[in-house]
Amino acid sequence: MAEREVETGPRKRFEQKSDAVFDEIVENCGVMDTEMSEDTDHNLTPTLASMSYGMPNQTGSENSLLDEDDYFLNSGDLAGIPVVSSDNEDEQDCSSKDNLVSSVHTDGSLEVERRAAHQESDNENEIQIQNQLKKDFPKQFDQVSVFKSIRKDFCLVRENSKETFSGKEKNRDLTYHEREKRLDKPHKGLDSRLKSSFFDKAANQVEETLHTHLPQNPETNFRDSSYPFASKESIGSELGNSFASNIRIKEEPLDDEYDRAVAPQQGLLDRVKDEPDNAQEYSHGQQQKTQEGELKISAVFSVSGSPLAPQLTTGFQPSLASPGMNKMLPSVPATAVRVSCSGCKKILQKGQTAYQRKGSTQLFCSTLCLTGYTVPPARPPPPLTKKTCSSCSKDILNPKDVISAQFENSTTSKDFCSQSCLSTYELKKKPIVTINTNSISTKCSMCQKNAVIRHEVNYQNVVHKLCSDACFSKFRSANNLTMNCCENCGGYCYSGSGQCHVLQIEGQSKKFCSSMCVTSYKQKSAKITPCALCKSLRSSAEMIENTNSLGKTELFCSVNCLSAYRVKMVTSAGVQVQCNSCKTSAIPQYHLAMSDGSIRNFCSYSCVVAFQNLFNKPTGMNSSVVPLSQGQVIVSIPTGSSASAGGGSTPAVSPTSINSSAAAGLQRLAAQSQHVGFARSVVKLRCQHCNRLFATKPELLDYKGKMFQFCGKNCCDEYKKINNVMAMCEYCKIEKIIKETVRFSGADKSFCSEGCKLLYKHDLGKRWGSHCKMCSYCLQTSPKLIQNNLGGKVEDFCCEECMSKYTVLFYQMAKCDGCKRQGKLSESLKWRGDIKHFCNLLCILMFCHQQTVCDPPLQNNAVASISMVQAASAGPPSLRKDSTPVIANVVSLASAPAAQPTANTNSVLQGAVPTVTAKIIGDASTQTDALKLPPSQPPRLLKNKALLCKPITQTKATSCKPHTQNKECQTDTPSEPQVMVVPVPVPVFVPIPLHLYTQYTPVPFGIPVPMPVPMFIPSSMDNDEKATEGIEDIKEKLATHPFEADLLEMAEMIAEDEEKEKTLSQGESQTSEQELFLDTKIFEKDQGSTYSGDLESEAVSTPHSWEEELNHYALKSNAVQDADSELKPFSKGETEQDLEADFPSESFDPLNKGQGIQARSRTRRRHRDGFPQPRRRGRKKSVVPVEPRSLIQGALQGCSVSGMTLKYMYGVNAWKNWVQWKNAKDEQGDLKCGGGELASASPCSDSLGSAQDHALSQESSEQGCKARSVKLKEDILSCTFSELSLGLCQFIQEVRRPNGEKYDPDSILYLCLGIQQYLFENGRIDNIFTEPYSRFMIELTKLLKIWEPTILPNGYMFSRIEEEHLWECKQLGAYSPIVLLNTLLFFNTKYFQLRNVTEHLKLSFAHVMRRTRTLKYSTKMTYLRFFPPLQKPESEPDKVTIGKRKRNEDDEAPVGVEMAENTDNPLRCPVRLYEFYLSKCSESVKQRSDVFYLQPERSCVPNSPMWYSTFPIDPGTLDTMLTRILMVREVHEELAKAKSEDSDAELSD
């Protein structure tokens, strides 16, 4: 017995000094803990079970607040413990570490299984301990595998837990006595082993505690990383009973007072309140627990952990089995939980700001990591996120557009992309019932189909039967019926079936077909809407919906207003409602507003107390205090009266008992209501100009470091003008009044007008190239461009920072610059160069008001604190003395308030348990309603103890705004020596034009002296007299032709403007007069509707010095093309390849020209009726007016209708394909005109036979051209004059269609016209139909001579050449002398019906006269009349004039034809062009009767008064021009029409 006592004594001393053991193990196991965290093997299984003997109830409820049948942790256990969220919150497991019990036991078999396990473990542990003592102690310590952790996570479900804390204590006491008996029974040989066994158990507990604080991965469950007992299997189970022999344990003198102070007070632990877990437990309640101090914490969030965690662990240390082991062991200092950034994996330091996305659990160190993690730059979207519409089977790209619906027959929900698809699917699902009434089917009034009728509409006394919703919608649209239509989707609202939803917004009732449409309408409109109760303004998307008894949905700004509104509705109705406590039907006298906005009605205050006791049941004391959780307010309604809660007033309340906490709750409600009313009051700003108050978005002006606010744009502009708000314009460099200030690359630029701003942006675009035109976040222009796809839209940003901030703003994680709340920010404002974002208009007004007021306004927290202090002071004295202040109006991170008990463990420092305190960390809110605990003993002096002391820290931000004041001061400049002016007489004679002297003074006098000045007058006169007469004629002509003076003046103005523009541009030389004449762009201005000299400006090119000028411009074009290869890209080159395939003769629709033909025919008849009919037998030709092309094809050049515009890319592509084929065929790459090497074939010559190639070669060799080697170029603009001339000569002979067939002659002319237009479009002045290209014209004339117009089956003539094509490629007009001649030849052929050269040579100036006739309504018409010369009887029979009626020998006179003017387009008017032609001819030829077409001068300028010589034009040149004109379809139509009229007249005669 003495030996047993000797062994037991050291064991007790060891157990009493276990705190020193824990301290030393922490220091020596740091390296082990690190290695253990790195090498974790999850596949190991526990092999040692020796730890089940010494501490069988080690994880009892005092240790971890867990029972064997109840594994759900109380929220009080986790209060203050840092939470590390996992990636998937829905799959979080509540795991527990337990080294004894590995299975869940039921309530009935718990004690039996425990006893059996202890008996079996006693026998096994005795054998294992004996074997363990035989082994070497240091050798076991060297095993590396003992440091590998085994963690098994399992989900603990707490659903059937009904055991109270008192019941748990009884089980613990029973287990404790049984364990005491078993500990006293061991024989003497077990004492030493007990000491070793306990040593190992303590070491395992320390290792288990250290392992829980190791850094965890983001995927680890938060209970694994934060709670010390989160693992099912103990790590120490593999450690065994061995430690290193060199571990030294520090021994200190015993201190019983310290152990007594460390031990938790049993009375306080017995009164810990359980936290309700779910709605079922919350409604049924829990068993009673006494409570002395209650602490309600909504949520605590911290990055580096909470200081309450180690205190909580210390306060709940389990008591050991034996009396000697019943001392409380101090907890090991918890290792700081290391939280890592999910983006860059960096460890977040304590106090560092962390970012978290709404709805996600991942933490980030910065916004760059946040945006980079969520939106990877090259990460494709997962294919699993796409959903398919169940109706149309299309992919729904935007998740917000998904409409989920569940039908009766299926358990799964269906996804739809729109409401129409949902309706269509519902129609398909419904069974089709065919109703046969006397075998007659009913026809739908809309679609005219026989179907089942679903709608019958009585409209205008007619019943319309409709078969479907689609037909019903079409019927409503056709008749403009808008009854019962959904405001969101436009569908029909079936009000009779109760499916119609009514939303009361802005004083109007809007109807919706479903609740989804109501929500969608709120999100889309997002209007500022007043609350239905307090009338405070707020965005409709943020308000709370409530449907009243009438079915209308109203909007409320907060849960408080919704609760007050429901109380008002219940009390104002005066109906009996079932009490939520006693279930009796009576008029409610008390209402309890819950945190979710719902209302609980009670008939008496006792029912209120009974209802709250379901959640908080105090025992052992009769307290009159009813603790209120956050969000609960008791409203008392006096008997026989009702509370009014309209407008912004609060409902009338009266506390039943002055000593109850209901009075304090009502005081808090009143304080909160007053604060909300103050914060929601509309703030008005004062306009800086008109001094009026306004509540709209202000117009801001940043000038000289000050911000000026205006009510509108007009006031801002007027203020700038009055106060001379001027700055240097960034574009025009002139100091003017600022119109707008724009930010470019971080610098503000001022502009005087919108034009200057646009021009400056245009210049920047040329310099920068691809740049950010407008940053989506900071609204500035920057040369750097960063794009990101957000919400299906590509946004532009100027830098990474702006993209990061915009992403935070897009995902509604940014905070408002006004109210500092996080959420959707729909308003923005530019303030001092920065963009501020706000929730709504109220926040903008509040922000601007705060900036204008000198003293900063009180913050929300300060107002709330003041209100709550006043509320607390208004209560009874006893209540103020016993309770702590309540912190209100703080945004909570928890979804619902939860009352979480806790125990203060600072008794070691103070020696007594103080009142419960509150701690605010970050954005968390803490509310404390507690009673004063009984007084404790005075603190005692402690001796040499290391305590875990962590002060409660609080971060406080103070906003200090300095008072700014402007004061003008002046610094005196250093004084300079004063300069004294001393007059010194100087003997200088100064002549003064005054009569001060007696002698005469010379005065300058001007005498006009004639000086001869040489002048060069262009004239072809032979002698001086004729020259003088020519000068007089020119003077008279200029005086009598004012329109020509206008032409010359317009040409001079255009030349002067061009000179000024070239002078302003740097590096450009003056434009000479010859360059002005040759530059096409100078004169290609917009052609107006008046004459005003535009004909003169069209005169661009002349035939003088053609070869030199064309080579010069060809070389210049080559340089331009090399510098800018993208001058004219082949935009349509891929499509415009085969002209005849795209425009076949079969597709010609003569109806497209019907309008013009009818107009011409009517005009001809009208003019014929207006002319007096001659009495002679020969009928006079009617007037042929010019076809008003502008009415059909547009007034501007090149803007014709499809099918009427010249597609010049056909010619360019044909040239390109031909050159490619030519270069590929000829190895030398030389173009040889003539000889045997001119083998012609098509680009697709592979489909042709060798016989065709040989025939083409023979045909080309017969041309007789001199062989010249020319390198062909695909780009026609790069060809010189000679290359282009020879190339075109060969091109028209060898070009083929893509299928290898030859082009028709009209198609070849079409291709050549396209090439001509392409040259003009790109700045080349070459006219390929003039004398320098004579060889090409000869070959083209030969080719066109064999062409005859195609007669279609309907009788119309077909040709691909139209009149508009000649106007577009500048072959008609007044651009040059030869073009003007070609235009007159065209008009004479078309309207005078002159078909050959012989008939045209009969024209003369004497036979063509300009006449004017007055028509109806006093309108005048100018026309040209041509009188053909008399036919001589001896004229040869083969020279009969075609197109004119054959006359008998007794005819009196030939018939005169007329050509009317074109008033719609003066530039295409035949009369004006003829007058312009006369002005450019010599006076000597204007009365000649033998000539009409004159030879152009070799050298002339546009300002020259004469373009033509006195000699007639060569008949060969005239024939070449006429051949091309006869290819025009409109000419053949006019000739055919005139021929038919002549034949009709002959038949009538």
UniProtKB/Swiss-Prot annotation:
Annotated keywords: Acetylation, Isopeptide bond, Metal-binding, Phosphoprotein, Repeat, Ubl conjugation, Zinc, Zinc-finger
Modified residues (Phosphoserine): 109, 121, 161, 197, 242, 1065, 1072, 1182, 1257, 1540, 1543, 1548
UniProt feature, compositional bias: Basic and acidic residues: 1125-1135
N-acetylalanine: residues carrying this PTM: 2
One family name in Pfam for this protein: zf-FCS
GO molecular function, one term: zinc ion binding
Domain of life where this protein originates: Eukaryota
Modified residues (Phosphothreonine): 106
Any GO BP: cytoskeleton organization
UniProt cross-link Glycyl lysine isopeptide (Lys-Gly) (interchain with G-Cter in SUMO2), position: 139, 148, 195, 201, 232, 250, 273, 289, 327, 400, 428, 430, 1035, 1062, 1081, 1128, 1432
InterPro entries for the chain: DUF3504, TRASH_dom, Znf_MYM, ZnF_MYMT-QRICH1
Keyword Ubl conjugation attached: yes
Start-end of Basic residues biased regions: 1161-1182
Function: Plays a role in the regulation of cell morphology and cytoskeletal organization.
Protein name as it appears in the record: Zinc finger MYM-type protein 4
Gene: Zmym4
